[in-house]
Amino acid sequence: MDTSEARNRKVVAVEQFDLEVPETAHQISSDSWFQVAFVLTTGINSAYVLGYSGTVMVPLGWIGGVVGLILATAISLYANTLIAKLHEFGGKRHIRYRDLAGFIYGKKMYRVTWGLQYVNLFMINCGFIILAGSALKAVYVLFRDDSLMKLPHFIAIAGVVCAIFAIGIPHLSALGIWLGVSTILSIIYIIVAIVLSAKDGVNKPERDYNIQGSSINKLFTITGAAANLVFAFNTGMLPEIQATVKQPVVKNMMKALYFQFTVGVLPMYAVTFIGYWAYGSSTSTYLLNSVSGPVWVKALANISAFLQSVISLHIFASPTYEYMDTKYGVKGSPLAMKNLLFRTVARGSYIAVSTLLSALLPFLGDFMSLTGAISTFPLTFILANHMYLVAMNDELSLVQKLWHWLNVCFFGLMSLAAAIAAVRLISVDSKNFHVFADV
């Protein structure tokens, strides 16, 4: 028995042999690394980028925000490469995050990982619905000031559109041309936000960059912003995305990750820094609410943000859709009547619940903080480092082992602190605003 076989036998405990990993009803191993890179870049430059000036830079200031974003980029790339390198660990492909965790740890961690991932993706999708609703409301107030339509109404409309799109696109690889559309939409709202913010910044030289609030409030908002930093760069579904890439899967995924964390982050950096430079501590959590300019330009940007949020939600909901399709044995043509009806009921119900929660508590920054705290930190940093430590234990030096344990402990503490801060933020906002608030 060679070292590799011994390691695999050591990792796969007896409990794991009772774990049945289902085949997938979705398409895998069909996409180029470049298409996968666009999926990742779509996630990082989704309409969420319009919130980072207000949810990251305002609480952290110039030094904390710039250094934090650069560090978050580096550590996120590192953590994602760890996960990507384990995709074929043990001589088989692990097309789901929970499959990889189950193979390494056993049945209990399979379930825990699926629970963490489900919460992560569910909350991200709630955020996309809030974003889409906010974008629609922003268009409405450009032309009407009667206040007849409130944010919850627009969130409901966004939910319906997201459900229709989910029914029409059967799986992640089927996005195809929609990824190109998403890129064009992202370019539109990012360019508009940058140009209008820069114009406002030039015309309004006086602004305040001081971090606002009391000492205790600053502590909680800074901690929450740290969770927003890691939320910005991580999908929480890397193995599911990697499952779509052609062989060689590790090499191609590494290309996609390097693209995401170099070329892909530049638009996000630009809109985040310029937005904060223009408006300082008064920057809105949805940047397009701060900009001034021609009505038709702002309407175009908001409509683009709305449509891009619909596409992005489908990406982050795909693991849940894959689970439902596989569990209930969906087979045959995606256009078959029974499959259309199944997607209508299953995906429609999922979107309906997400939409209800989004309308109930439409606090975008709080959602980002809580998601980063309770799921992004554990999935992307704690679990990734510990899985790599367990899987590659015999090949790591003492220094490397200590490094991974340091990451596990540090991000564990960060996750706990950020969760406390996020819950406090939600509690404060819930007192200041009623449910179904028009924020």
UniProtKB/Swiss-Prot annotation:
It comes from the Eukaryota. GO terms for molecular function: L-proline transmembrane transporter activity. Disruption phenotype: No visible phenotype under normal growth conditions, but mutant plants grown with exogenous high concentrations of D-proline show reduced inhibition of root growth. The chain crosses the membrane at residues 32-52, 55-75, 121-141, 154-174, 175-195, 219-239, 257-277, 299-319, 346-366, 370-390, 403-423. It is a multi-pass membrane protein. Keywords: Amino-acid transport, Cell membrane, Membrane, Transmembrane, Transmembrane helix, Transport. It holds the Pfam family Aa_trans. GO terms for cellular component: plasma membrane. Expressed in epidermal and cortex cells of roots. Expressed in stipules. Induction: By wounding, drought and salt stress. GO terms for biological process: proline transport. It is found in: Cell membrane. Treatment with toxic concentrations of proline reduces shoot growth and root elongation in wild-type plants, while plant lines over-expressing PROT2 stop growing shortly after unfolding of cotyledons. Proline transporter that mediates proline and glycine betaine transport. May be involved in the uptake of compatible solutes from the soil into the roots, or in retrieval of apoplastic amino acids delivered to the roots via the phloem. May be involved in delivery of proline to wounding sites. When expressed in a heterologous system (yeast), imports D- and L-proline, glycine betaine and GABA across the plasma membrane. Has the same affinity for D- and L-proline. Belongs to the amino acid/polyamine transporter 2 family. Amino acid/auxin permease (AAAP) (TC 2.A.18.3) subfamily. This is Proline transporter 2. It comes from Arabidopsis thaliana. The gene is PROT2.
